[in-house]
Amino acid sequence: MHTLIERLEKVTNSKELEEARLSALGKKGVFADKFNQLKNLNGEEKNAFAKEIHHYKQAFEKAFELKKKAILELELEERLKKEKIDVSLFNAIKTSSSHPLNHTKNKIIEFFTPLGYKLEIGSLVEDDFHNFSALNLPPYHPARDMQDTFYFKDHKLLRTHTSPVQIHTMQEQTPPIKMICLGETFRRDYDLTHTPMFHQIEGLVVDQKGNIRFTHLKGVIEDFLHYFFGGVKLRWRSSFFPFTEPSAEVDISCVFCKQEGCRVCSHTGWLEVLGCGMVNNAVFEAIGYENVSGFAFGMGIERLAMLTCQINDLRSFFETDLRVLESF
């Protein structure tokens, strides 16, 4: 067993060190073999041999740790020499293309701002009133169960949508209002099509009663979707949202299969892209507005980016793999 420590002293790198460890301490190593021999011994001879094995094993383990420390320090020193960088040398900064989510945000903003929509940014932390109650979602409303919310102890929460920005804007301004808001939102969900943090964009137009009609909303939405996706077909479906009445959802013809039917569109030929509607009077009453009308719409930025980039896993946008991000 003296030869084990002698072999250890001759080790010069991590690979040889691991080989020495396995030959001594592995399942088929020298010490395992010695301990296995104890079953053939009896009495004092067995006890004496066991003590001797333990003595050499402890000596080897101590020598191994010292050698391991020395090898790691030596390899680190060698690596630092090889990786030494001359900071005085010029090095061109590597740039890449815009992140798909940033590209999508900018494309949306470029459409709405020339139409007179003002970009509003709100807080990520909200209270119950702005996130729920003011949007016709009182505490007992079943629609709250659809949103797994991150709550804080002081009755604050991480906003589950960007709609609170609309409430703040209406509280701070008087009609006419024409705004869009975008940013991070949070819900407790994580799978191929959901992440705990995601981005939304919403729009709001408010003016004196009778000045804003559903036809205005329809025109804006159709112009935007044709601008964003090109020559796609559109389908309007009636829907329900507590904060709009009437409400609608808009689908586009599948960009993956051209309506021939595929797994992405569930073989329907249609893909849901946004929800919209005329602002519910209950929302205006919560703000204190009278004799006004307006429309609102909202969509997920990741959803739009997934369709334009034609990817199936939403989580790809949040990974730091440059090979993936540079492919968009």
Swiss-Prot record:
Cofactor note: Binds 2 magnesium ions per tetramer.
GO annotation (BP), single: phenylalanyl-tRNA aminoacylation
Residues spanning the membrane: none
PROSITE patterns reported for this sequence: AA_TRNA_LIGASE_II
Gene Ontology cellular-component terms listed: cytoplasm
Subcellular location, record wording: Cytoplasm
Enzyme class: ligase
Cofactor(s) this protein cannot do without: Mg(2+)
SUPFAM superfamilies: Class II aaRS and biotin synthetases, tRNA-binding arm
InterPro entries registered for this protein in UniProt: aa-tRNA-synth_II (IPR006195), aa-tRNA-synth_II/BPL/LPL (IPR045864), Phe-tRNA-synth_IIc_asu (IPR004529), Phe-tRNA_ligase_II_N (IPR004188), Phe_tRNA_ligase_alpha1_bac (IPR022911), Phenylalanyl-tRNA_Synthase (IPR002319), tRNA-bd_arm (IPR010978)
Listed EC numbers: 6.1.1.20
Pfam families for the chain: Phe_tRNA-synt_N, tRNA-synt_2d
Catalytic activity from the UniProt record: tRNA(Phe) + L-phenylalanine + ATP = L-phenylalanyl-tRNA(Phe) + AMP + diphosphate + H(+)
Keywords: Aminoacyl-tRNA synthetase, ATP-binding, Cytoplasm, Ligase, Magnesium, Metal-binding, Nucleotide-binding, Protein biosynthesis
Binding-site list for Mg(2+): E245
MF term (GO), any: tRNA binding
Lineage top rank: taxon: Bacteria
Subunit structure: Tetramer of two alpha and two beta subunits.
Family assignment from sequence similarity: Belongs to the class-II aminoacyl-tRNA synthetase family. Phe-tRNA synthetase alpha subunit type 1 subfamily.
Protein's UniProt name: Phenylalanine--tRNA ligase alpha subunit
Lineage: Bacteria, Pseudomonadati, Campylobacterota, Epsilonproteobacteria, Campylobacterales
Gene: pheS
